[in-house]
Amino acid sequence: MAKTSMIVKQSRTPKFRVRAHNRCKICGRPHAYMRKFGMCRICFRNLAYKGEIPGVTKASW
């Protein structure tokens, strides 16, 4: 879980656009961010297993 101070700091619009970093919308994690879904890989995996992300299914072959 990300620090609350970092999440609050990130929610404000930065003075310069380059300073903005992507964070997971669920847990606030800055690493392993998936831009298409707006969340980190861990939250993506949990929601995909539960079937809460439309169009995403577990691969089997």
UniProtKB/Swiss-Prot annotation:
Protein origin, superkingdom: Bacteria
Any single Pfam family the record assigns to this protein: Ribosomal_S14
UniProt GO cellular component terms: cytoplasm; small ribosomal subunit
Binding note for cofactor: Binds 1 zinc ion per subunit.
PROSITE patterns xrefs: RIBOSOMAL_S14
Gene Ontology molecular functions: rRNA binding; structural constituent of ribosome; zinc ion binding
Record InterPro entries: Ribosomal_uS14, Ribosomal_uS14_bact, Ribosomal_uS14_CS, Ribosomal_uS14_sf
Positions annotated to bind Zn(2+): 24, 27, 40, 43
Keyword tags: Metal-binding, Ribonucleoprotein, Ribosomal protein, RNA-binding, rRNA-binding, Zinc
Requisite cofactors: Zn(2+)
GO biological process, one term: translation
Function: Binds 16S rRNA, required for the assembly of 30S particles and may also be responsible for determining the conformation of the 16S rRNA at the A site.
Family to which the UniProt record says this protein belongs: Belongs to the universal ribosomal protein uS14 family. Zinc-binding uS14 subfamily.
SUBUNIT field: Part of the 30S ribosomal subunit. Contacts proteins S3 and S10.
HAMAP family: Ribosomal_uS14_2_B
Name of the molecule in the record: Small ribosomal subunit protein uS14
Taxonomic source organism: Heliobacterium modesticaldum (strain ATCC 51547 / Ice1)
Name of the gene encoding the protein in the UniProt record: rpsZ
